């Protein structure tokens, strides 16, 4: 598989979530992707944060994708419109429920939710991947690990 190279013509930075939302309001229906440049906190430069950008994208029926390093102060996060095959994560379902309650969803974002509920993708949302907790480790394995650490 060839490496993904962001298109500079589709790369933008926004100082605020409101600026990103304004761009999506004007471009959500005709653009196929956006590589959003997000500056790291330590850079001292204010850009929309990943969490803010994800909320805005979900409200407009878009979704995050690949993340690529850009320079020492920032990274690029790819956003695209959801498709009929876009899978949902439980995390994004939770975000959407919060955004609906806050009255932030647009009709475009809500349409994606409605379609996902109708075709089963909403109910099939995958759970977040978490590291194993102590409770999920079999007792015999835990005893062996504890024994090994004791010696």
Task: State the predicted function of each range.
Residues 1-151:
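Charge-dense, helix-prone N-terminal extensions
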């Amino acid at each position: 598989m060839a490496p993904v190279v962001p298109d500079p013509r589709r790369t933008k930075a926004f100082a605020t979530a409101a600026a990103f939302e304004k761009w999506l309001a004007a471009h959500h229906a005709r653009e196929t992707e956006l590589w959003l440049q997000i500056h790291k906190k330590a850079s001292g430069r204010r850009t929309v944060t990943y969490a803010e950008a994800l909320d805005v994208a979900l409200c407009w029926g878009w979704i995050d994708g690949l993340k690529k390093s850009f320079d020492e102060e920032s990274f690029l996060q790819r956003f695209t419109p959801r498709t009929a095959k876009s899978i949902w994560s439980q995390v994004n379902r939770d975000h959407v429920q919060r955004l609906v309650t806050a009255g932030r969803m647009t009709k475009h974002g809500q349409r994606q939710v409605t379609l996902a509920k109708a075709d089963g993708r909403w109910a099939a949302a995958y759970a977040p991947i978490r590291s194993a907790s102590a409770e999920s480790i079999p007792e015999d394995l835990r005893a062996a690990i504890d024994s090994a650490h004791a010696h």
